[in-house]
Amino acid sequence: MAFTGNFMCTSFKQELMEAKHNFLASGGDTFKLALYDNNASFTAATTDYTSTNEVGNSGTYAAGGGALTNVNPSQPSTTVAITSFGVLTFTSATITARGALIYNTTAGAGTGTTDSV
């Protein structure tokens, strides 16, 4: 199945209500971005990072992806709140990626989690 669609994981929406994710630049959780080939199949029901169909190591890209740099959330209007991440680059990499998954490696209890965003 080809990699299709854009999703905000339903589990992430619930976890926001549980205050499980901290996006602050200072003291916030660690988020990573993993890259996937065209065989990856994610839906809104995706709950965790998986190595299945992740692209191979190349240059500075390694299994599990790269750590993102948190940017403090902001409220640009009365009805919108956003968060962002700094630019992530993988040098000397030759990769054919068709999609990505952002996930939290420190959600809730501290370390070792792989909750998808």
Regions found by a protein language model. Give the residues of each.
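Small cysteine-rich, disulfide-bonded extracellular modules of the LU/uPAR three-finger superfamily
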Residues: 1-98, 105-117
